[in-house]
Amino acid sequence: MDPRTRLDYALFQLTPTRTRCDLVIFSGGENEKLASGIFQPFVTHLKSVSDQISKGGYSVTLRPSSVGVPWFTKVTLQRFVRFVTTPEVLERSVTLEKEIEQIEDSIQANAAAIAGEAEGNELGGTWTSQKSTALSKTKGETDGDTVEENSKVGLQRVLENRKAALCKEQAMAYARALVVGFELDYMDDLFSFADAFGASRLREACVNFVDLCKRKNEDRMWVDQITAMQAFPRPELTFMGDSGIVLAGEENDLLNATNVKHGNSMDASSQGSFETGQEGRAQMAMPWPNQFPQYMQNFQGHGYPPPYMFPGMQGQSPYFHGNMQWPVNMGDVESNEKSSKKKKKKKKNKKKSKQDESAEPSDNSSTETESEDGNEGKKQSRKVVIRNINYITSKRNGAKESDSDESGEEEGFVDGDSIKQQVEEAIGSVERRHKSTSHRQRKHKSHNGDDDSSNKETKGNDNWDAFQNLLLKDNDSEPEELLRISSTALNMASEVVRKREPPSDDSFLVAIGNEDWGRETSIEKFNAGENVRIIRKGNNYDEEMLNPGRSDESRSYSQAEMSVHDGKLRTRNEAEEDWFIRNQAGPETDPSLVKTFVGDHFHLNKSSERDVLTDDSFMIHSRVENQVEDSRLRTEIMDLDVYGTTQQENSAPENTPHEPDDLYMVLGREQDVKPTLLPWTPEIDFETNTLAQRTSRIDLITATKASAGEQTLDGKEKKSRGISKGKDAKSRASSRPDPASKAKRPAWGSRAAVSKSKSEMEEERKKRMEELLIQRQKRIAEKSSGGSVSSSLASKKTPTVTKSVKSSIKNEKTPEAAQSKAKPVLRSSTIERLAVARTAPKEPQQKPVIKRTSKPSGYKTEKAQEKKSSKIGQSDAKSVELSRDPSLEIKETVVEDSHSYLSEKQVDALPAVASVDDFKDIKELHSLPSEETARVKNRPNEIIAEKVQDQTKIDDQETVKNTSVSEDKQITTKHYSEDVGEVQASQEKPVSPKKSVTFSETNMEEKYYFSPAVSEIDISTPPATEADHSRKKWNSEETSPKATAKVFRKLLMFGRKK
C-alpha cells in the first residue's frame, strides 16, 4: 500500500488474552498489517484506545471524526508506531539540549571565577590559564594557590569536552529522527493525529522537537554536525528499543540491532575522550555485527533477543556463542598422556637392554638382547621362543642333510645352555606378568614369592621339562593340544588363573565378553591339576552356559544371563523377576539348605546326600511375545492334562527388564516331547451342549403339551388354539440366535474347538430343522381342525373371521355332534352348513334345529365381519396365492352370508347353470379336513412323529385340487332348492378384486414348494390302525362307494369342461 494512501480506519486486533495485538489499516477494499506486538504501549499513548478497551472487547478501532482527512495516512501511523516503540527518537534531542545548556552555564561560571582571580595580574593569570598543566607536570609545585588554579582550569577543560560530546550526540539523535521520518514538513500531520486520538505525549515531543530544530538551524556548527552524522550507515542510525512492538518489514533490523540499551543511542559518559579520533573513526565502514567466518555461513546470528516471537521472526539457537573458540579435544590430551608414558617406558627398556648387551659376550649379544627385551615385552618374548622352537624342532625331527652348510653354521651359533637359559627367562617373564595381574586383582600369591635358591632351581627344572615336552611334540599336533599341555604345566602348585571372583566353589565356566564385545575370553574358575581343555566361549555362541550336570554338590547359579545379539557376546544383570531357579530336591523341606543372596548371585549350599533324588523342574517367568529375541528359550503353551516342553539350553533375553505375563511350570527336560496343540476347553463346550440340550428339551415338552391339548373336546378347542398360537410364536422366536448362547460359545482360539463347535452346530441345526418340521405339522393340524384351508388362511390373516367361525361353531353344536366325538362337524361357512343340512332327512327332528342355527350363524358371521372391517380395512379381502402349482389359484370372495373359496378357473369358465355341481365340489373341498381333523385328534402322536417335509400340506393341496371325498350327494328337493338359492344369491354379489397373498415368512422358516403329483390313495385312504373309524366313515350313507364313483365322474367331466 502506498505510504500516502488515505485510510478509512485502523484496527487493533487483540489476542484472547488481550496482551498482544496486530495493527491493521483499511483503505477502501484493501487492508494491510502495519505492526504487531504488545498492546499496552498503545493504551498508554492513546486516550481513545484506553477508553475503548475499558468497555471490553477484542478489537479497538481508530477512526477519525471526518472521512477522508488528509493527515490520516499510512505514513502518519508508521511515525506514530515508531514513536510508541522508542519515544526517545524525538525526546532525546530535547533532553540533550537541556543538558548542554546546563553545561554551558557551568562553563561560564567557572570562566568568570578564573577571570576574577586573574584581574590583579593579567600576565600571571594568562600564564596560569594556559600553562597550568605543563607546570604541574614538570615542576610539581605543592603551593596551595597553584593547585587551586590548576583544578579550576581542569574543570573548565572537562566541561568543554562534555559539551562537545553532548552536541555530537544531539546531532546524532536529530539525524536519527530525520531518518525515521520525523521531518519538519510532516509534523503537522502528527499534530492532527495527536489531537484527534488524545496522544498528548506525542504532541509534546513534536512541539519541543520543532522548537529545537528552529533554533539549531541558525547555528552553522549544528548543521555541520548533522551532515557528519548522516554519513553513518543505516544500521548504525536505526534506533530500536525493546518495547515489544515491531513494524512490518523491519524484523531484520531488529535482529541485527545488538548491544543497544533501552532509551539510549549512545552513552554520553563514554565520550570523554571523543575529541580527536572520532571524526576519522566515524568515516570508517563499520562492519555488520553479525558477520561470521565462512565456516559459519548458516548461523543466523545473535541479535538483541526480543521478549516475544512475532510472525516472520526466525528462531535462534541459544547454545552457540559466536565469539567462542573451537573446544579443545579432550581425547587428544589423554592420547598425548598415554603416548608420553609409552615413550618413557620405551626409553627405559632401551637403556636396560643396552646395559644387558654390555654385560653379555659379543658372540651372542643379539640373542641376549632379545631375551632381555622379552622380560619387559610379551611380544618380544614370544618371538624369541617361537624362533628357537622352530629351529630346534626342525633339527630334532630329522632335517635333511642337504643344507649341511647352514646347519653347520647354526650349530656353531646355538648353544644348549644358552637356549635353556633363554627359555627359562622367557617363561619366567610370563609368570611375572601373571603375578602382577593377579596381585592387582587381589588373587593368590604368585610363583615368585619364595627367595630360596633351591626352590628356584626346581622351578626352573620344571619349566625346562615343559619346554622339552613342547619340543618333543610331533608336527601334527593341534594348537589346542599344545595349549592344553602348556596350561597344565603352568598351573603348578594349585595355581588358579582367574579374571573375576567366582560366587562360590564350583567348576562353573561362564564366558564373559569385555568391552570389545567378545574378543577376549576370561575364565571364572579353573580347578587346579585337572587336564581340562580350555573352551573359548567367544567362538561358541550356542553354548554360553556349561551346566556341570546332576550332582548333589553345593551349587551357585548366577542371575547374570548371557545373550548373543548381532554377533556380539554380552552379559547383563537381569532385574527383579526376570530369572529362573533350578530347584534342588525340595528346598522348603530340606533343613540342610542355606539360602543367601550375595550381590547378583543366588547361592544354594547343600550338604552332599547321595540318596536324595534331584528335582529338575524349572520355574520360568514367561515373556511377552514381541519382547523375546530369537533364541532357543521357548515355552510352549501346555494342555490342561499333558505337560511337555523342550529343553531350555540358552536364552537371548531382552535388553530391558519387564513384568512377566504368566507363570508356567515345566516338568522334565526331555527333548523328544513334541509341543502339544492348543487346549480344548471342555467346560466351555459343556456349557454350550447343556444350553443346546436344554433348548431342545423345552421344545419337545412344549410340542407334547400342544399335541395333548388337541385331544380335548370341542368346547376346549379355542383354548388349544390359543396355546398353539403361542407355541408358534415361541418356535419362531427360538429360531433366532440366543444372546446367552453367544456369550457361552467356546473361544475361537484353537482348531480343535473350532472343529468341535462346527460339528455341534451342524447337529443343532439338524435338530432345529426337525423341531421346525414338527411345529409345522402341528400348525397344519391346527389349520385342518379349523374346518378348511380357507378358514385357516382367514384365521391367520384376520382375527375377525376366526372369531366369527368360533362363534358359529359354538352356536351350531347339536346333540349328535356332542355324542359322536370321533366325527365332529365344523361349520365355518355356508357350504359346511349346507353339508350338515343334507344329513337331516334321516333324522327329521334335527332339521329345524339345523336351519335355525345355520341362518343366525351366517348373520352373526356377517355382522362380525362388518364390525371388524372398520379396524382392519381391506386386509380381509386379501387372497393367498400358493406357489405349489402354477395352474392352481385360489380366489377369496367375501359375501354376506358365507365365505366361498372357488378355483379361479372355475369362476371364469363355468356358467351359472352348473352351480349345483360347483357347490358339490366345494362342499367336498371343505368336508375332508373335518374328517382328517378327527383322525389327527385320535392320533396326535403319530402326526408329531411323522418325518417328512410338507406331507400334510401336500395332502391339503391335493384335496383342493382333486376333491376326492366320498360323501352322499342325494338330498331332498326341499333342501336342494334352499341351498341352491343361497348359492345363487351369493353369486349375485360383486366379487372382490383379486389380491395375491403369500404365506408370511414368520409362520415358517423356509419357503416350501409342493408338487401336486401325489397319489389319491394317500389322501382318501386312512391308516390301517384306524380300521374301525374308517369303516364307520365308509359305511355311512354320506360316504358310500356309490357317491365316490359319482365324484370321480364329476372330476373327469370338470377336466373336460376346462
From Swiss-Prot:
Skewed-composition ranges (Polar residues): 126-136, 262-276
Residue numbers covered by motif Nuclear localization signal 1: 340-347
Cellular component, GO annotation: nucleus
GO terms, biological process: anthocyanin-containing compound biosynthetic process; chlorophyll biosynthetic process; positive regulation of DNA-templated transcription; response to light stimulus
Main location: nucleus
Ranges for region Disordered: 123-147, 262-281, 330-463, 708-887, 1020-1041
Species whose genome carries this gene: Arabidopsis thaliana (Mouse-ear cress)
Motif (Nuclear localization signal 2): 431-438
Comp. bias (Acidic residues): 403-414
Biased composition, class Basic residues, residue ranges: 340-353, 432-446
Motif (Nuclear localization signal 3): 764-771
Domain of life of the source: Eukaryota
Oligomer and partners: Interacts with COP1.
Phosphoserine modified-residue sites: S477, S915, S986, S992
Sorted UniProt keywords: Activator, Nucleus, Phosphoprotein, Transcription, Transcription regulation
Induction entry: Triggered by light. Repressed by COP1 in darkness.
Function comment: Exhibits transcriptional activation activity. Positive regulator of light-regulated genes, probably being a direct downstream target of COP1 for mediating light control of gene expression.
Keyword Transcription carried by entry: yes
Biased amino acid composition, Basic and acidic residues: 447-462, 757-773, 860-869, 878-887, 1026-1040
UniProt protein name: COP1-interacting protein 7
Subcellular location: Nucleus
Compositional bias (Low complexity): 783-808
Observed effect of gene inactivation: Defects in light-dependent anthocyanin and chlorophyll accumulation, as well as defects in the light control expression of light-inducible genes involved in anthocyanin biosynthesis and photosynthesis.
